[in-house]
Curated annotation (Swiss-Prot):
The organism of origin for this protein: Lupinus angustifolius
The family this protein is said to belong to: Belongs to the 7S seed storage protein family.
Biased composition (Basic and acidic residues): 33-105, 136-174, 184-203, 389-417
Name the UniProt record assigns to this protein: Conglutin beta 5
Note: The variability of the residues taking part of IgE-binding epitopes might be responsible of the difference in cross-reactivity among legumes.
MF-aspect GO terms: nutrient reservoir activity
Superkingdom of the organism of origin: Eukaryota
Gene that specifies this protein: BETA5
Biased composition (Low complexity): 606-615
Coiled coil: none
Function: Seed storage protein. Accumulates during seed development and is hydrolyzed after germination to provide a carbon and nitrogen source for the developing seedling.
Alphabetical list of InterPro entries matching this protein: Cupin_1 (IPR006045), RmlC-like_jellyroll (IPR014710), RmlC_Cupin_sf (IPR011051), Seed_Storage-Functional (IPR050253)
Length: 637
């Protein structure tokens, strides 16, 4: 019994060990089957299937899964319980998928299309993401290629510039001392290039009007700029001469001013930072010049001229009842070249008083009174809330009229009471007016008259080195070609119409042999009242009058100027040439040249169309002689 008791526990223990071994073997065998199960590799193959292959339908997938399950059941009949659980789960999944498919079939057609489009967009985005790295690599390669190409080009450009610099240095070394002359020559070439461009612009003008506008020496009356204008008159200033062309740079400090006023009007007192030479071209005037110790008034008529120094206070009256007053002035600015300003002591609606520029304390100390009284008497009230009485007082003082105001008969009589007239004959005074036609003309015949006042004959214009000319050309007459040796003349057309021809020189540069070629250039324009014409020194000129023409001229740099005529019986420089020189320089013989010069028996002025008129008379004479014969023959036949 005791042995049985001992063996029974051992038997139980052995059975337990065997059971444990069997269980462990079964577990191991089950894991081995799980590892060897072909379902998972197939599922991985499904997951790793190439996305480019067309997707299979759900029915095909279910058939494949069912086929795999049948194989597993045949291969492993011992996995009944676990297989039943898995089959139940798969059945539930199939039902869910079947329900989802039924719901999708019940959705509208456009929803399915929308899903398909979304899937297509997702596929395109995925493809774009896959292609993006490749694009970036290509862009980097292109950038690297372009940068290398640009570096190569920049290197070539640097080498090219270096070679050009070396060539330039070699040329400079070879030329040596002539480099200074070449730099001057280059500047002159640039200057002449600008002139050539201007002249080409003039040649391009097809119409006469465009040609007039492109002529640098001609300024129409429309080129005046209005400084002030009201119902009583206007003040105009011509544009600067040097703005048109650099050939007139020596005239940059000279301006032409013109003012016109109605009858019985007064141009208010003022002074300017410019010297003036004024000339009356229409009507009558009374000018009053105010100095610190005295006041002088002069009566001016047509052709009278007067020097008005800079800083001199003056005012001009038009005393005539019918005629307008027209005055032309040559202004010579003092402070700034080409710019001048007028300073008025009184305030108007268009002009402030120079007293308004001072402070209140300065004005009170200057006039030794309160500022209110100074404002009431000199400055006027600028407050819009001034009372009616003050406003009426300002209207009576003509502050609302402007710079040119009307005056009464009584005021005109008082202003002219002590005025002096200009000197018609004898020696001109040092301060009073003088008339341009007071002396005999220097050139005169039946076709015209030429008056001139030179600096050595008049002390008023001597320090300014200015001369004045006044020319009268009859209708159909010609001022013969001539040129001035030193003076530059600014001509103002006072009255009439005509044509002028001015001869200049154009410089051209030949690039091959680097030589300058001078070509003759002709400038011409139609002249009318108010136009301005500039005649440079040394430039031949002729003027043809289509109606009675009157010209006023200001000569700049006029001291010792000489006028040289190119035709006519007197003062003809061509006539004074030696006979041998005439033989050399002209195509014709010396006898032919002298005979040609002697054909013109007039001097300075001549008939503008002598040959045409003579031919016309000859034709009329021949027609008159043939008249009776032709009438008889026509009667006979």
């Amino acid at each position: 019994m005791a042995k049985m008791r001992v063996r029974f526990p051992m038997l139980v223990l052995l059975l337990g060990v065997v059971f444990l071994l069997a269980v462990s073997i079964g577990i191991a065998y089950g894991e081995k089957d799980v590892i060897k199960n072909p379902e998972r590799p197939e599922e991985r193959q499904e997951e790793e299937r190439d996305p480019r292959q067309p997707p299979r339908s759900r029915q095909q997938e279910e058939q494949e899964r069912e086929h795999r399950r049948e194989k597993e059941r045949d291969r492993e009949p011992s996995r009944g319980r676990s297989e039943s659980k898995q089959s139940q789960e798969e059945e539930r999944e199939r039902r869910k998928e079947h329900d989802r498919e039924r719901e999708q079939e019940q959705q509208p057609q456009y929803g399915r299309r929308h899903e398909e489009e979304e899937k297509g967009e997702e596929e395109e985005e995925g493809q774009a993401r896959r292609q993006r790295p490749q694009r970036r690599r290509e862009e980097r390669e292109q950038e690297q290629g372009s940068s290398s190409e640009s570096r190569r080009q920049s290197g070539d450009e640097r080498r090219h510039r270096h070679e050009k610099r070396e060539q330039r240095e070699e040329r400079e070394q070879e030329q040596g001392s002539s480099s200074g002359r070449q730099s001057d020559y280059g500047r002159r070439q640039r200057h002449e290039g600008r002139e050539q461009r201007e002249e080409r612009e003039q040649e391009q003008g097809s119409s006469s009007e465009s040609h007039r506008l492109r002529n640098p020496y001609y300024f129409s009356s429309e080129r005046f700029q209005t400084r002030y204008k009201n119902k009583n008159g206007q003040i105009r200033v011509l544009e600067r001469f040097d703005q048109r062309t650099n050939r007139l740079e020596n005239l940059q400090n000279y301006r032409i001013v013109e003012f016109q006023s109605r009858p019985n009007t007064l141009i208010l007192p003022k002074h300017s930072d410019a010297d003036y030479i004024l000339v009356v071209l229409n009507g009558r005037a009374t000018i009053t010049i105010v100095n610190p110790d005295k006041r002088q008034a002069y009566n001016l008529e047509y052709g009278d001229a007067l020097r008005l120094p800079a800083g001199t206070t003056s005012y001009i009256l038009n005393p005539d009842d019918n005629q307008d007053l027209r005055v032309v002035k040559l202004a010579i600015p003092i402070n700034n070249p080409g710019k001048f300003y007028d300073f008025y002591p009184s305030r108007t609606k268009d002009q402030q008083s120079y007293f308004s520029g001072f402070s209140k304390n300065t004005l009170e100390a200057t006039f030794n009174t309160h500022y209110e009284e100074i404002q009431r008497i000199l400055l006027g009230y600028e407050d819009e809330q001034e009372d009616e009485e003050q406003r009426r007082e300002q209207e009576q003082s003509h502050q609302d009229e402007g710079v040119i105001v009307r005056v009464s008969k009584e005021q005109i009589q008082e202003l002219r009471k002590h005025a002096q007239s200009s000197s018609r004959k004898g020696k001109p005074s040092e301060s009073g007016p003088f008339n341009l036609r007071s002396n005999e003309p220097i050139y005169s015949n039946k076709f015209g008259n030429f008056y001139e006042i030179t600096p050595d004959r008049n002390p008023q214009v001597q320090d300014l080195d200015i001369s004045l000319i006044f020319t009268e050309i009859s209708e159909g007459a010609l001022l013969l070609p001539h040129y001035n040796s030193k003076a530059i003349f600014v001509i103002v057309v006072d009255e009439g119409e005509g044509n002028y021809e001015l001869v200049g020189i154009r410089n051209q540069q030949r690039q091959q042999d680097e030589q300058e070629v001078e070509e003759v250039r002709s400038y011409n324009a139609r002249l009318s009242e108010g136009d301005i014409l500039v005649i440079p020194a040394g430039h031949p000129l002729s003027i043809n009058a289509s109606s009675n023409l009157r010209l006023l001229g200001f000569g700049i740099n006029a001291d010792e100027n000489q006028r040289n005529f190119l035709a006519g019986s007197e003062d003809n420089v061509i006539r004074q040439l030696d006979r041998e020189v005439k033989e050399l320089i002209f195509p014709g013989s010396a006898e032919d040249v002298e005979r040609l010069i002697r054909n013109q028996q007039q001097s300075y002025f001549a008939n503008a169309q002598p040959q045409q008129q003579q031919q016309q008379r000859e034709k009329e004479g021949r027609r008159g002689r043939r008249g009776p014969i032709s009438s008889i023959l026509s009667a006979l036949y």
